[in-house]
């Protein structure tokens, strides 16, 4: 698949709000000439983007309103608005309450290349766990809307603040004959000391998030 123009890093997506999202920039480039599964003895956790890239998988970021065979719904509670930033990678959708925390972000990548979905999802939470002083509160490997998925919830330190995050990766696939795979990244972030006060809105966003095949 052709590389995206400028190959913008998704690590820039939440810079303005102080969070540290997964970096999928490697998937927006051409794959390595020799692909491996990286079976070295190193104990260093491998993020899902790095894992997929090592298998030669590439991805094209697709805005939510440009998806033709998939529908991804990001609900917007009262008081939440679209959060725009020129540093965002093209196609990123982010909303925020009163232009600050809490925030919700969705990134969709159209994938090219074969890989073991179950194995890939073992790497889905690594980015979150690599955040500074990350403390896991909850996790799940249950399917989401009928698709393979991994979720992790926890708190971490960033820019002098303690943040609470809910992070879900979903890997849907369209029916035959296309069998097109996507990677959907959904992240909700708020200040940890405001998580209880903002729980109604956060719960509404999480419960309203859906992934369906058209």
Task: Report residues per predicted region.
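N-terminal targeting sequences that direct proteins away from the cytosol to non-cytosolic compartments
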Residues: 1-91, 178, 189-214
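Short acidic-hydrophobic surface loop/beta-edge motif
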Residues: 58-68, 93-97, 140-143, 154
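A short acidic-to-branched-hydrophobic micro-motif
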Residues: 93-119, 166
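Solvent-exposed loop/turn segments at secondary-structure junctions
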Residues: 111-113, 156-159, 190-194
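Extracytoplasmic/secreted proteins, especially bacterial periplasmic and envelope-associated proteins
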Residues: 119, 123, 201-204
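Signature of long, low-cysteine stretches enriched in small and polar/charged residues
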Residues: 125-177
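Short hydrophobic/glycine-rich mini-motifs in sensory/regulatory modules
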Residues: 177-184
